Amino acid sequence: MSGQQRGSVILVPEHLAGALTKLMSDFITGQDVTLSGGNIAVKIRDAINQTPGGGDVAILSSLFALWNALPTSGRQSSRDDLIPAAVQALTTAHNLCLGVIPGETSHKDTPESLLRAIVTGLQKLWVDSCGCPECLQCLKGLKAIKPGLYEIPRIIPHTKQCSPVNLLNMLVHKLVALRGHVQLAYDARVLTPDFHEIPDLDDSDAVFARTLLAALFHLNMFFILKDYITQDSMSLKQALSGHWMSATGNPLPAAPETLRNYLEAFRNSDNHFYLPTTGPLNTFKFPEELLGRVVVIDSSLCAASHVQDVITRGVGAGVPRPRFLALPPAPSREPQQTCSQLTSRGNESSRRNLGQPGGTSPAVPPVCPIVSLAASRAKQNRGGTGSLHLAQPEGTSPAVSPVCPIASPAASRSKQHCGVTGSSQAAPSSSSVTPVASLSGDLEEEEEGSRESPSPPSSKKGAEEFEAWLEAQDANLEDVQREFSGLRVIGDEDEDGSEDGEFSDLDLSDSDHEGDEGGGAVGGGRSLHSLYSLSVV
């Protein structure tokens, strides 16, 4: 390959042109990830079998050819595509700092001064909020952060891991150790720490910490991308300057034409070949010009408002700080709910876990256990008469569920919970139990018996039946728990002062009771006697 050709002259014998051309082509296209601007000079020396300390003209000419081919190469083009991402990261970090630490930052700050302001703010926050040995250790990690392709040490106390830190360190490891390429597919949310990735702080301090950390992570992403974009050009210029100094004893000239003319003077008929290049000679200010395209504040690419939405509103990857519900107020000791309403909560819970009880329609409220037991005993004692039955109100279907025997002082409450339409019969003042019809037995016979004896039994007999039922329930706790699922019976004197036989408060942590009507305060802390106490009209 002798003769004058367009391109950069490479002063090596023609028999070495094949191996050297392949090496230089792999560097320009980026196919060989092991090649970089820092080690390409050594690779060239190995390819031409030149010992260290030998003539630098061959290596100098090869480096100059790569320098002229770099701006339009596929290797540099893939890095230029990351310039908008780097500008966005820097602009976002800058605007986040102006929002939370406006006194320590300004529009004229360099990325390095911005990093120092963020580190100072985080160090002060860790000391003021806790100051334990772990926090002090993280202060050293913050101080050790350096701009560039460096991993982030431990900087957040009282946390096991942080997703943005893992992402950035993995990216650095891929670029430095594995010599990989960067293909960014992320948005600002992945560089915003979640609320569980910071220490347990007050709400205002938590927002401040997450904002400063998000600014720090965006700034670190900028430093990584900046070095990745400009590293090859800077390393190649440094190698070119060193070999020019070794060959001539002078610093690198300002114009590339000086170096080209120097190399052309060594060209003979059999000691060179040309590497084709396009375009003019690459200026030696190329790294600085490339850096000027990266270190830019562009408000059109800023994602600071999006990061603030993630932090303050809990959208995207960020999750708002959890709010724990307050415990329900202590219930009144006066019975204000009917038995059917109290037991319906347990039956609703049972239906969710075990399905619909056999023989019970979803549209029919559960049968009151007092009614069933009292009615069956009344039939046995009185020979099956209907003295315990009230007349069915007109217009009411026989399928209407019975009213609880514990009559509420308000008639409207009885109609609401027991499903009775029309006018309701008030309990006489001499009786505290209002007996009603039971679903067991023939409904027509019960209606007829109710018409014959519409008046309820005496209060004395009703109280005796009720006390008998209470004794039966105390004898068999399992039946009580089955009939009143959702409530639990506690034993003797507990730590909270509740007595034997009392129902403790509903367990709010049980998922079965979440969403029940009444907010979990119904029946809490009441005994059997208080739940089914004899009412006085």
Swiss-Prot record:
Can you tell me which residues the record assigns to a coiled coil?
A: none
Identify the main location: virion
Give the compositionally biased regions (Low complexity).
420-441
Please list the residue ranges that the record marks as compositionally biased, kind Polar residues. Answer: 334-347
Question: What is any Pfam family matched here?
Answer: DUF832
Q: Where is this region: Disordered?
A: 322-466, 486-537
Biased-composition ranges, Acidic residues, are: 492-517
Answer yes or no on keyword Ribosomal protein.
Answer: no
Whether Mitochondrion counts among this entry's keywords is no
Protein's cellular compartments = Virion tegument
Q: Which GO terms of the cellular component aspect does the record hold?
A: viral tegument
Q: Which UniProt keywords apply?
A: Virion, Virion tegument
Record-stated family? Belongs to the lymphocryptovirus BRRF2 family.
**What's the protein name?**
Tegument protein BRRF2
